[in-house]
Amino acid sequence: MSKWKKFTSACLVAALSTALLAGCGGEKKDSAAANADKYVIGASFELTGNVANYGKSTLSGLKLAVDQVNKAGGVNGKQLVVVESDNKSEPAESGNSVTKLITQDKVVAVVGPATSGCVFAATPVVTSNKVPLIAPCATAPAITVDNGQVKEFIFRACFIDPFQGRVMAEFADKTLGVKNVAILHDASSDYSKGLAEVFEKTLNEKGGKVVAKEAFLSKDIDFKAALTKIKAANPEAIYIPGYYEEVAKIIKQTREIGLNVPLIGCDGWDSPKLVEIAGPEALNNTYFSSAFSVQDQTESVQKFIADYKAMYQKDPDIFCMQGYNAGLVLADALKRAGDGADGAKLAAAIAATKDLPVASGKLTYDKDHNPIISAIIIEMKDGVQSFKEKISL
């Protein structure tokens, strides 16, 4: 999930070119054979650039999973080795990052990138080389399915955008008890537009109504004109699907004009920067969908939190958890595929994952390579995240 979900044709051309170069560089050695004494896992993440926080967090979770697997004896008698590659938060660089991991480091699979745009750009490369890729937190539906066709080598470890859009409409209807809702979305983000569309459709199905719908653009800083129009429509709540950079400013300005209705959003809100920019008081009576909360008392969640804190001396966030889950999925699939399995056999093993114990509970893949999981609703109280409820649809 991220603002890089805008998958431009230029990015596709760059990625396709990279994939062709990867395929034309002479005979490609089988990646498993090249590292006979270990399994090398490629970690292509946003380690610098605009969304480096996402990439670094996700990578930390992956490393924890690998550390635990190795300490338990590894997989098929081999240790797992993570090779990092920085895609610089740029879709155009993502293809280069993954190409290097496949052609030079001979990885058996790729975990990452964190953002949908970078995953889209990496997809032609891994597909042409028949190397599975698990995207820990890329939520765009088209990541795993293109025009009804499931992508054989692409998987994810998070819920998809339509799911969290429906979840928040359910929350608005059942928990908040509101029917008249305004929407303020980012017209420059496929992520935001997609969430707004699904939320509105689901709300209408439940007998609700969108009384105002306004838009902004990424990097905007003044939202009061749109908010004034929304205020005039007298909404009972406002749905703001977007990223913390803009959302924090929107929340602050919403309160400044005296609009104190509940504000609800999505997993793009999840960042400490949200509190820094908006301020703790403005965030009261706000809620967003996520897949993780440190206050979730589920046994598997609390064990993951304790293990993560023991390794990193701080609490994990949603991205850490999703990276961790992706690592466990890959390790389990490597074991079931067997030593020496090629990319197609490994991909089939990933697709067959069923009831695998992970941080969030038990993970099973559906036919579209998406995990079947629940959503968490986070409530902000004086700048602190609070577990509100868990929703399964």
Residue positions per predicted region:
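Extracellular/periplasmic periplasmic-binding protein-like sensory domains
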Residues: 251-324, 379, 384-392
